[in-house]
Design a protein with these regions (language model features):
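Solvent-exposed alpha-helical segments within well-ordered globular domains of core cellular machineries
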Residues: 28, 50, 66, 82-86, ...
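Active-site glycine-centered loops adjacent to acidic/histidine catalytic or metal-binding residues
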Residues: 67, 127, 156
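Switch/connector loops and helix/strand junctions flanking conserved nucleotide-binding motifs
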Residues: 73-75, 106-107, 131-136, 160-165, ...
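Extended helical scaffolds that flank P-loop GTPase cores
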Residues: 149, 176-286
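Conserved G1/Walker A P-loop phosphate-binding module
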Residues: 1-76, 90-91
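Conserved C-terminal guanine-recognition region of P-loop GTPase G domains, centered on the G4
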Residues: 50-60, 83-153
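Canonical P-loop GTPase G-domain recognition
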Residues: 130-186
């Protein structure tokens, strides 16, 4: 992997997404031969890092691209999920580019929702738009961007379309050239007071580099790693937290329901699908 020259300003960008969304294609287009393949520390999971060089206003710039394992969530139920969330929280890349399948936007927005709670700006690469178009799924990037509060870039990576625009959007977010005000999903209304109670109980106890609100949500979700971390950290002060979590064992459903309600509102606003029974272009071609 060719290192950036001393004259280049280098930023680090994590490339994230669910499996089979074209993330590897994007990574290869961005880095070409300037990549290194190894394993994540202590894991047998492949770790790919590359460098993308570009110019902005005559200035030479370099992006160090870290290809995170494909994951459906950041719940740490698998080594891939553990790696993805630990990297973003502990290493704090300058930005995360989340690659999504435009034809399965609802499913992909769940992972995006989790990244929005982490302390790193996010850009959404809406990939496989050609597949969505063949299925006559119409997505308004402008409405989607307004609803999410993050930059949205339509892409068809297999045709190298939109990849340069993704780099430009990530660059602008990192430089603060565009406003970044993400719209995060709220927990279901009947559990918002519970979330606030947990946040109050753990205030001042959350170790760096973990965000307080994210830790509170993970405790409500029953995340094993975060529960163990906070129990060991708080020791005798853990008991009130444990009591609240025990009384509200259904909180995981409240967190998930809040996210699905948020996803539903966004999709209804930004996505148009063929009417029930309507024959799509894909059907006609088949």
């Amino acid at each position: 992997m060719q290192p950036p020259s001393s004259e280049e300003r280098t930023v680090t960008v994590a490339l994230a997404g669910q499996p089979n969304v074209g993330k590897s294609t994007v990574f290869n287009l961005l880095t070409g031969l300037s990549q290194h393949v190894g394993n994540w520390p202590g894991k047998t999971i492949e770790r790919k890092v590359g460098v993308h060089h570009h110019r902005r206003d005559g200035e030479s710039c370099a992006m160090r691209i870290v290809d995170l394992p494909g994951t459906y969530s950041l719940t740490a139920n698998s080594p891939e999920e553990q790696i993805a969330r630990d990297y973003v929280i502990r290493e704090r890349p300058d930005a995360v580019a989340v690659i999504a399948d435009a034809a399965s936007l609802e499913r992909n927005l769940y992972l995006l929702a989790e990244f929005l709670f982490l302390p790193v700006p996010v850009v959404l690469g809406l990939n496989m738009t050609d597949v969505a178009e063949r299925q006559e799924i119409r997505i308004s990037p402008r409405i989607l961007e307004a609803a999410l509060g993050v930059p949205v870039v339509p892409m068809t990576a297999t045709k190298n379309q939109g990849v340069g625009e993704l780099v430009a959007a990530v660059d602008r977010v990192i430089r603060g050239a565009i406003a970044y005000h993400p719209s995060r999903p709220a927990i279901r209304e009947d559990h918002r007071a519970v979330l606030e109670e947990i946040r109050t109980l753990i205030a001042g106890q959350v170790p760096d580099p973990y965000p307080d609100e994210w830790v509170a949500l993970k405790l409500l979700e029953g995340d094993a790693e975060i529960t163990r971390l906070m129990r060991e950290r708080m020791q005798e002060r853990w008991e009130p937290v444990r009591a609240v979590l025990t009384r509200h064992e259904d909180a995981l459903l409240a967190v998930a329901s809040g996210r699905y309600e948020w996803i539903g509102r966004i999709v209804r606003a930004a996505v148009t699908r063929p009417r029930a029974g309507q024959i799509t272009l894909t059907d006609r071609l088949d």
